[in-house]
Amino acid sequence: MAIKLIVGLANPGTEYAATRHNAGAWYVDLLAERLRAPLREEPKFFGYTSRITLEGEDVRLLVPTTFMNLSGKAVGAMVSFYRIQPDEILVAHDELDLPPGVAKFKLGGGHGGHNGLKDIISKLGNNPNFHRLRVGIGHPGDKNKVVGFVLGKPPVSEQKLIDEAIDEAARCTELWFKEGLAKATSRLHTFKAQ
């Protein structure tokens, strides 16, 4: 099944743009830049969107302009308009359980406490069977510090690692369309930024 929608999760506004919680949007921004497909605000989809072509496949890019916990509103609008199935969606999000410099593809699973994923699963009729790109941001070491951590900006050294992992994830996304998910996954899962 080909991917028809790639979503980068984020909170809107300049005050959140550089926070860890916006790592998913950084990936979609990079894809849009690499493929020369600038994102434009599209109110009916509650987000910034663009259209790219990968190996002859039409793919929509989406960065919701809703707050993170309402991400499903944007995804739901696009899915119903373009008749996209859950397994044709790739959602990029920040991942506490992976260190900076690591990114991994995954199909299905729970939301792991991520409010963006939680809302998307709910708006897809409680169907969690969409693809995810988990962008490692690390963990503060104390669950009580998670909110401040994800809404904080990574130090320069961590930002560099996250950026390198996102860069590799973008290359592996293109590889996915060329040579399949297994090959793309194998390459991405052996990558660790230094």
Curated annotation (Swiss-Prot):
Alphabetized UniProt keyword annotations: Cytoplasm, Hydrolase, RNA-binding, tRNA-binding
Q: Which GO terms describe its cellular component?
A: cytoplasm
The UniProt entry's sequence similarity note says: Belongs to the PTH family.
Q: Which GO terms describe its molecular function?
A: peptidyl-tRNA hydrolase activity; tRNA binding
| Thylakoid keyword on record | no
What does the record give as the active site?
21 (proton acceptor)
Site keyed Stabilizes the basic form of H active site to accept a proton: positions: 94
GO BP terms: namely: protein quality control for misfolded or incompletely synthesized proteins; rescue of stalled ribosome
Query: What biological function has been recorded for the protein in this entry?
Result: Hydrolyzes ribosome-free peptidyl-tRNAs (with 1 or more amino acids incorporated), which drop off the ribosome during protein synthesis, or as a result of ribosome stalling.
Q: What is its EC number?
A: 3.1.1.29
Q: What is the lineage of its organism?
A: Bacteria, Pseudomonadati, Pseudomonadota, Gammaproteobacteria, Enterobacterales
Give residue numbers for the site Discriminates between blocked and unblocked aminoacyl-tRNA: 11
The subcellular location is: Cytoplasm
Q: Which residues bind tRNA?
A: 16, 67, 69, 115
State the reactions this protein catalyses. an N-acyl-L-alpha-aminoacyl-tRNA + H2O = an N-acyl-L-amino acid + a tRNA + H(+)
What is the name of this protein? Peptidyl-tRNA hydrolase
Q: How does it assemble?
A: Monomer.
| Species name | Salmonella choleraesuis (strain SC-B67)
Could you tell me which Gene3D superfamilies the record lists for this protein? Peptidyl-tRNA hydrolase
Name the encoding gene, please. Answer: pth
Membrane-spanning residues: none
InterPro entries, alphabetized: Pept_tRNA_hydro, Pept_tRNA_hydro_CS, Pept_tRNA_hydro_sf
